[in-house]
């Protein structure tokens, strides 16, 4: 640039810069090209800055004219850059969407449908049946104390169930519950009779694993406490439940013994030509009621317990309890 410059020369440079900017911006194909143009036109070392730098050689009264024209051009270029950027971004998005178009007519690979585990559905069916009879669901901890698991249920200290060969002891006074009956005691401590509850849950016993036994399995306990309950109410409840669950299978009651019920009975159903035990039940022993501060002369009740695995195996014709725990999808997908 010469040592002297005129107002007309700078004005001509700004006009030429405007024309070049308009043409270059319109031809820019992507955001990177627009950014390069912005730097070359409006950057600190850009062409507009060069023109403004030469403005100092003009007489003071002419400088505002050049400055005003340069500001207008700068605003114009910024607007053109912004508008063109939106255009190229929209074009890039449209091109990407075109390339990524999904063919909705193409055959789908299919997503396998999940299945609820048969133990879960069996438990829910049992609980639903008793809920329909007016029973409320109750739950309790799986880690229990000796008191709730044994003593409060009238199980004496010399009873075989207390032996370490049958129970998982955790140290101190704690153990893994061997049945869900402790839920009944805990519930009665907090809720005065009359009560009707059904208590599903996981239980633990030191059983060897075979086709019919597992150290971890599931039980459902039923308890009813009210005035005037007798064995006929127990029998009627059990019969109604078994008919609803199994249909018209033959059922029989056999006299038995449980420390916390008296009289006690085991319940069998006829399955595959033989009698199969499915439940234990009985009238709540007066000693259990007295331990809870209830007058056995006023209150009576019955309790029943069943193994969910046994009910599930009978319902679905499963011959080995271990099948329920293998997580073999070929087996589980049948349900």
UniProtKB/Swiss-Prot annotation:
Q: State where the protein is found.
A: Cytoplasm
Q: Which co-factors does it depend on?
A: Mg(2+)
Q: Which UniProt keywords apply?
A: Aminoacyl-tRNA synthetase, ATP-binding, Cytoplasm, Ligase, Magnesium, Metal-binding, Nucleotide-binding, Protein biosynthesis
Q: Which GO terms describe its biological process?
A: phenylalanyl-tRNA aminoacylation
Gene3D superfamilies documented for this protein:
Bira Bifunctional Protein, Domain 2
Q: Where does Mg(2+) bind?
A: 262
Question: What is the uppermost EC class here?
Answer: ligase
What sections of the protein cross the membrane? none
Cofactor detail note: Binds 2 magnesium ions per tetramer.
GO MF, one annotated term: ATP binding
The family assignment reads: Belongs to the class-II aminoacyl-tRNA synthetase family. Phe-tRNA synthetase alpha subunit type 1 subfamily.
> Quaternary state and partners of this protein?
Tetramer of two alpha and two beta subunits.
Recorded protein name is Phenylalanine--tRNA ligase alpha subunit
Species this chain originates from: Prochlorococcus marinus (strain MIT 9313)
Q: Which gene encodes it?
A: pheS
